[in-house]
């Protein structure tokens, strides 16, 4: 399995790390036989990313699954599309237009929608409760996610 992640100093790193830890817990309970390989892609270095992916797939031609723990699953899907390759499963985050297009073509298997509007609303509400109403704030607020696939992506946007 290929795992793509941000450099550690990225501001989204904490949320991504927590998502990865949950994924690894699931893997340890359900799929102990999976081998995980890390690759760090850089947002602005398309050529470097291509070289890293070339080297990875040359060294690990048996890789069949991929998980991208940030919003750039489209980079991997585009790379695979250009190479005429496809993974048995490729999962990513966020409903960027590029990501949803690759989801619709089947080159991305699942996208995890994190409901950013709801997250923003809850953040402002919590801030208001704390600052204006002097109410205590919880350190962690669990939020719902949506698991989307090509069969339900069009319906999802109808109800936003």
Summary of predicted features, one role per range:
Residues 2-3, 23, 103, 127, ...:
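Hydrophobic structural packing positions in well-ordered secondary structure
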Residues 97-108:
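Glycine-rich, charge-decorated loop segments at or immediately adjacent to ligand/cofactor-binding or catalytic sites
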Residues 2-24, 28-51, 68-72, 94-96, ...:
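Hinge/beta->alpha junction and helix N-cap segments in small-molecule ligand-binding domains
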Residues 41-99:
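Hydrophobic alpha-helical
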Residues 115-160:
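Hinge/cleft segment of the Venus flytrap/periplasmic-binding protein
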Residues 88-89, 110-116:
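Short, glycine/charged-rich beta-strand-loop motifs at protein surfaces that mediate ligand recognition
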Residues 31-33, 85, 105-106:
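Short, well-ordered coil/turn elements that cap or connect secondary structure elements
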Residues 20-25, 75-80, 128:
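Short, well-ordered amphipathic alpha-helices
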